[in-house]
Amino acid sequence: MGEDTIIVPTILTDDTNVFVEQMKAYIAFAKRIQIDLMDGTFTPNRSVPESSISQLPNGIQFDLHIMAIRPSDHLSEVLRLRPHLAIFHAEASEDLLPIFDQLKKAGIRAGVAILPTTYPGLIKKYLEVADHALIFAGNLGQQGAKADILQAEKVKIIRSIKPDIEIGWDGGANLTNVRALANYEVNVINVGSALSQPEDKKAAYEALAAEAKKRGVFL
């Protein structure tokens, strides 16, 4: 709890220039980065496509959060990029178990994302197999949403199904709530606008990381 929580910058854009700029900024200080990819069907808008990413830089863990209605359409590009973790949504139109199987055979960790209206107990078969569960508490395809901290109640339900699973949070994380999220025993806090908007991104990242290490209300 707290000291085990990592802050992960997220990149969400449909502009390749912005993608490159944010990538350059974040790899200078972050140990792990999440790239959000959207198909324009599961989400209201599209992101830069996986095919536009020639390769992922070495020395940093990359997570791909694929917001797509048909995960199988994106699997070949994910396997080509070989990220640390690939996250697909439980609400997709396809069974994720064959996708997870192919990811694991390729040495890629498998993650399942859960929208706010999805009860974790209904996707037990995915949680039992996945390496990572992403509690999505924002608006699909957008950064800067207000965090719904009540979604963190899903942590204990997920842990009751698979105690050792890594749990991530995506949606509205900022300096005012990362301590609370860390104290809910969220392992990974993905941060969008609270890092992309400040001019000094490294300082913002360090402040978030320090806050996430604190325990309780006053410490």
Question: What do these predicted regions represent?
Answer:
Residues 1-87, 93-95, 102-104, 109-110, ...:
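Conserved N-terminal beta1-alpha1 strand-loop-helix module at the mouth
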Residues 113, 134:
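Active-site pocket-lining/capping segments in soluble small-molecule metabolic enzymes
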